[in-house]
Every structure is written in structure tokens, then in C-alpha cells.
């Protein structure tokens, strides 16, 4: 099982901690020692599961915009956006602690701008989190026009990882970061993109097609 590079440090620290707990448990009276050792093993296995980073098959096709995150679409609405213009579509993907948390680039492009905002830590399924929570906003210049998406931390997730830089060329489906322990990713698509998803649908980062346009 591949472990996300963004989580290597956390996995190593957890493994060391659990090893110490396991050794300590060997010298404790039973069944307390067994219970403690089992809990440590369970915690280590959950950590490995959380930081898993499976390979994804990027769909072939012209003009595809793919999901940047695993999860469930909790909001889809039309709006006017300062980056993507009038008639844009917002798609919000909620990521539970049991989803893969590695984020992927939705479409080929050039990173125009990155903006980090400090903020609150409301529950990620609370739509106020889009504007009130800690977040990283990313603007891509694409062949179909500008596209905006945002990593939003949640009540449990308080660590956003984004390894992009302004001016960087990026390819659809490539890993660019993660949000730890439950969160959401919002993406705003310009009106030139035909939306292929609806609220309630589950998404797979790097595979689920959110929309398509012939303008690429």
C-alpha cells in the first residue's frame, strides 16, 4: 500500500509511538497489556489507512475536468464568481475521515495565484466553512479560461498541505497536496464547462469527471 508523501512524517512518528506503547504493554498485567497493545496496533493501522495513496487512472478525453478530491458532492449551485465570471458552477466535495485525502489537479493549466486564509474550524459540511474556515485558494489558467478551487480545513482537519507554486505548470490528475482528517474541496467551473455531476454523487479524485468543454 502506497503512503502519501505528505504523511510520511506522521506515519513514522505514529509507528515509533505505537512501538513504545507495545513494548510497555508487554510488562503490564493482563489483560490490560493486551488491550493496550491492541489499541496501539489499531491506531497504527488507522494511520496507515488514512494516509493511503492509491494510484488512479486518469480518464482520457478532450476538455475533461476531473474531481480534485474523494468524497461526496454536498453542494452544486450556479453563481457569479470574481475569478471564473458570471454563470459559473460551484461544486463542493465533502471528504470524511475515511476517504482518501490526497488532492489532485482537476485540469491541465498554469497556477496563476495561491492565497492562504486563516480562519475558523467549522464542520466541513457546514457551507459557512467555504468563507469562514482556514483555506487555500488556487487559481488555474486553463485553455478554457480561469478555474478556481479551494482546500478547506474542517473541525477535525486542521492541516492543509499544498505544494503548488505560482507560475507552475500542472497536469490533470497529478497530486498537489492533502487535507488531514476530514475536510472539503470547493471548485468553481466557468460557464463554458458542461457540468456532469449532481448533489449526492460520490467522487474519486483523478477519475470522476465533473465537467467537459470542447474549448481545450
From Swiss-Prot:
The record marks 182-183 as: Cleavage (non-hydrolytic). The keyword S-adenosyl-L-methionine does not apply. It is an enzyme of class 4 (lyase). Pathway: Phospholipid metabolism; phosphatidylethanolamine biosynthesis; phosphatidylethanolamine from CDP-diacylglycerol: step 2/2. Binds 1 pyruvoyl group covalently per subunit. Its main location: membrane. It is a peripheral membrane protein. Is synthesized initially as an inactive proenzyme. Formation of the active enzyme involves a self-maturation process in which the active site pyruvoyl group is generated from an internal serine residue via an autocatalytic post-translational modification. Two non-identical subunits are generated from the proenzyme in this reaction, and the pyruvate is formed at the N-terminus of the alpha chain, which is derived from the carboxyl end of the proenzyme. The keyword Lipid metabolism applies. The modification Pyruvic acid (Ser) is found at residue 183. It catalyses: a 1,2-diacyl-sn-glycero-3-phospho-L-serine + H(+) = a 1,2-diacyl-sn-glycero-3-phosphoethanolamine + CO2. GO terms for molecular function: phosphatidylserine decarboxylase activity. GO terms for cellular component: plasma membrane. GO terms for biological process: phosphatidylethanolamine biosynthetic process. The active site is at residue 183. Its cofactor is pyruvate. It is found in: Cell membrane. HAMAP family: PS_decarb_PSD_A. Belongs to the phosphatidylserine decarboxylase family. PSD-A subfamily. Heterodimer of a large membrane-associated beta subunit and a small pyruvoyl-containing alpha subunit. NCBIfam families: PRK05305.1-2, PRK05305.2-2, PRK05305.2-5. PANTHER family: ARCHAETIDYLSERINE DECARBOXYLASE PROENZYME-RELATED (PTHR35809:SF1). This is Phosphatidylserine decarboxylase proenzyme. It comes from Chlorobaculum tepidum (strain ATCC 49652 / DSM 12025 / NBRC 103806 / TLS). The lineage of its organism: Bacteria, Pseudomonadati, Chlorobiota, Chlorobiia, Chlorobiales.
Amino acid at each position: 500500500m502506497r503512503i502519501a508523501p505528505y504523511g510520511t512524517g506522521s506515519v513514522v512518528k505514529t509507528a515509533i509511538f505505537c512501538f513504545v506503547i507495545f513494548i510497555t504493554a508487554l510488562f503490564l498485567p493482563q489483560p490490560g497489556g493486551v488491550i493496550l497493545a491492541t489499541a496501539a496496533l489499531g491506531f497504527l493501522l488507522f494511520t496507515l489507512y488514512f494516509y493511503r495513496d492509491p494510484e488512479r487512472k486518469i480518464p482520457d478525453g478532450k476538455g475533461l475536468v476531473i474531481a480534485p478530491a474523494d468524497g461526496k458532492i454536498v453542494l452544486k449551485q450556479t453563481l457569479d464568481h470574481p475569478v471564473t465570471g458570471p454563470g459559473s458552477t460551484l461544486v463542493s466535495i465533502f471528504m470524511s475521515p475515511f476517504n482518501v485525502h490526497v488532492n489532485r489537479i482537476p485540469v491541465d493549466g498554469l497556477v496563476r495565484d495561491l492565497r492562504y486564509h486563516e480562519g475558523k474550524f467549522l464542520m466541513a459540511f457546514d457551507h459557512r466553512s467555504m468563507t469562514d474556515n482556514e483555506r487555500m485558494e488556487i487559481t488555474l489558467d486553463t485553455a478554457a479560461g480561469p478555474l478556481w478551487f479551494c482546500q478547506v480545513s474542517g473541525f477535525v482537519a486542521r492541516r492543509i498541505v499544498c505544494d503548488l507554486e505560482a507560475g507552475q505548470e500542472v497536469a490533470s490528475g497529478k497530486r498537489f497536496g492533502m487535507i488531514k482528517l476530514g475536510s472539503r474541496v470547493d471548485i468553481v467551473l466557468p460557464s463554458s464547462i458542461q457540468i456532469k455531476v449532481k448533489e449526492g454523487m460520490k467522487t474519486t479524485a483523478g477519475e470522476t469527471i465533473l465537467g467537459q468543454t470542447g474549448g481545450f
